[in-house]
């Protein structure tokens, strides 16, 4: 019985830790300016295992572009205080365009990742399975987006730059009065590693670990039952 308790404890620890982490497979940076002055750099850790198609598309646009057009020169065209900053329209630069390496649109991924803290990187869309080139970064917890948008990364450096973008003056349509422009983007070398965001609440901990732990617990209890039954007849 002691062995069973140890196995259950180890399984609980494993499922809890794995459920609350993301594997960062690559890091992309963007340098941003406003009113001809540098605002700073944002570094994104991308979740290539959770959202492989989305990460591949995002990296390709950053590094190679589509028909030669990358994110360089595009704007953060939508800025809403206490919500998000949005950019990446390499077609029209105003939020109306869409393109990707898969066509105009591609399917959703990683809809189970929740917007529990600022700094999550997600795909802007027009409804289910309408991802393209536009992306957003949350500046607050935004749970109302959960299940509706592909979340494929998180800011790991440069939230001060994100907040600086959030603070620029906008018009009544949430467009910055003076453009906020991506002047450079690229990739930072990294080996895949586990990233633990700072959004661990007790509820999130239970939600992440509960189902896999219960499943494992049931399997272990069934195994233990049959093991005892075998011992009774030996």
From Swiss-Prot:
Its main location: membrane. Keywords: Glycoprotein, Isomerase, Membrane, Rotamase, Sensory transduction, Signal, Transmembrane, Transmembrane helix, Vision. It is a single-pass membrane protein. Residues 29-187 form the PPIase cyclophilin-type domain. The keyword RNA-binding does not apply. The chain crosses the membrane at residues 202-222. GO terms for biological process: protein folding; visual perception. This is Peptidyl-prolyl cis-trans isomerase, rhodopsin-specific isozyme. It comes from Calliphora vicina (Blue blowfly).
């Amino acid at each position: 019985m002691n062995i069973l308790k140890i196995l259950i404890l180890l399984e609980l620890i494993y499922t809890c830790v794995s459920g609350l982490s993301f594997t960062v497979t690559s890091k992309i940076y963007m340098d941003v300016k406003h009113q001809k002055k540098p605002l700073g750099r944002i570094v994104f850790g991308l979740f290539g295992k959770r959202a492989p198609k989305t990460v591949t598309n995002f990296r390709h646009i950053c590094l190679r572009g589509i028909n030669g057009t990358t994110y360089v020169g595009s704007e953060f065209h939508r800025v809403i205080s206490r919500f998000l900053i949005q950019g990446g329209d390499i077609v029209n630069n105003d939020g109306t365009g869409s393109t990707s390496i898969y066509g105009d649109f591609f399917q959703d991924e990683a809809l189970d990742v929740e917007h529990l803290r600022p700094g999550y990187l997600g795909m802007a869309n027009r409804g289910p399975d309408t991802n393209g080139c536009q992306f957003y970064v949350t500046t607050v917890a935004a749970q109302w987006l959960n299940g509706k948008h592909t979340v494929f990364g998180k800011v790991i450096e440069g939230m001060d730059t994100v907040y600086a973008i959030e603070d620029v003056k906008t018009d009544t349509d949430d467009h910055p009065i003076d453009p906020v422009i991506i002047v450079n983007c690229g990739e930072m070398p990294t080996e895949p590693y586990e990233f633990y965001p700072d959004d661990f609440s007790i509820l999130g901990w239970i939600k992440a670990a509960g189902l896999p732990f219960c499943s494992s617990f049931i399997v272990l209890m069934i195994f233990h039952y049959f093991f005892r039954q075998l011992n009774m007849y030996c």
